[in-house]
Curated annotation (Swiss-Prot):
InterPro entries: Integrase-like_N, TACO1_YebC-like_2nd/3rd_dom, TACO1_YebC_N, Transcrip_reg_TACO1-like, Transcrip_reg_TACO1-like_dom3, YebC-like
Region (Disordered): 1-20
Protein's UniProt keywords contain Lipid metabolism: no
UniProt entry keywords in alphabetical sequence: Cytoplasm, DNA-binding, Transcription, Transcription regulation
Organism: Salmonella typhimurium (strain LT2 / SGSC1412 / ATCC 700720)
Gene Ontology molecular-function annotations: DNA binding
Name assigned to this protein: Probable transcriptional regulatory protein YebC
One GO cellular component term noted in the UniProt record for this chain: cytosol
Primary site of residence: cytoplasm
Amino acid sequence: MAGHSKWANTRHRKAAQDAKRGKIFTKIIRELVTAAKLGGGDPDANPRLRAAVDKALANNMTRDTLNRAIARGVGGDEDSNMETIIYEGYGPGGTAIMIECLSDNRNRTVAEVRHAFSKCGGNLGTDGSVAYLFSKKGVISFEKGDEDTIMEAALEAGAEDVVTYDDGAIDVYTAWEEMGKVRDALEAAGLKADSAEVSMIPSTKADMDAETAPKLLRLIDMLEDCDDVQEVYHNGEISDEVAATL
């Protein structure tokens, strides 16, 4: 998730879940294989692969494992016959939710996603029901840094926006295809980001209260536990006050 003040509780909760290293690695490897199969094995010429490589390295995947996954995709590995599927729906409190999946069996995947929604008070929607609320962006995050220096370097490199939060954290937003190029330019200027990811950024937010927040988090947990689910995006916002009660 992009940002800190807006998304900190979600990001930190997800980071704790990512301790399930085996499942996370399996999902990243699946994305590496698929991205390489569809767009070739050169990350500099394949934005989707570059984003997957960045995510793999951020999760401490070894270069050897990463390169083997790319080689499988380029070589047309029989296990790489996956397709990207996007599901949309509404969760507790009217939250808009997008689920990005990689699957070789649509029927299995939609059944798992629908089950999660039904268990948590949400509804799986039709194509386009919430997609218009989100924009696909690259998000390069700094936990701290000099705002003017980062902003100047980022905008010069082609970034679309730079946002500074109350806690001093800074997010650089880019066209998703340009994220790798902008990140490289920032690093060349001596500015090493703490994370970089492709995300779906919502244009509106849905405030969660003490009743709806835990239901939303449970839904996200259930969706992320589905083997075919790669990413879950939502526009729910949980205030610090509500988060403290969870």
